Curated annotation (Swiss-Prot):
GO annotation, biological process: translation
Annotated gene: rps15
Annotated source species: Marchantia polymorpha (Common liverwort)
Molecular function terms from GO: structural constituent of ribosome
Localisation: Plastid, Chloroplast
Annotated keywords: Chloroplast, Plastid, Ribonucleoprotein, Ribosomal protein
NCBIfam families: S15_bact
Name of the featured protein: Small ribosomal subunit protein uS15c
UniProt subunit comment: Part of the 30S ribosomal subunit.
InterPro entries: Ribosomal_uS15 (IPR000589), Ribosomal_uS15_bac-type (IPR005290), uS15_NS1_RNA-bd_sf (IPR009068)
SUPFAM superfamilies noted in UniProt: S15/NS1 RNA-binding domain
Pfam families membership: Ribosomal_S15
Annotated family: Belongs to the universal ribosomal protein uS15 family.
Entry superkingdom: Eukaryota
Gene Ontology CC: one annotated term: ribonucleoprotein complex
Amino acid sequence: MSKNLFMDLSSISEKEKGSVEFQIFRLTNRVVKLTYHFKKHGKDYSSQRGLWKILGKRKRLLAYLFKTNFVSYENLIIQLGIRGLKKN
């Protein structure tokens, strides 16, 4: 996999695991894994649907974080190396 998003999960408290930032981190890890999966299995359409659902959920969480805590949003975007939301 091209991105190494590994994080020591034992050092994170239960409260932090429910945070928006951590949820976005977990969804990004799943996106990276599925992207790698599609390099071998290009016609796996049921997994593609799952990827679209994950991307939609991550987009909604990013929009929420953008509205509530912009500084944290910017830091997370830089840390994960993902694109931000489109400007309308």
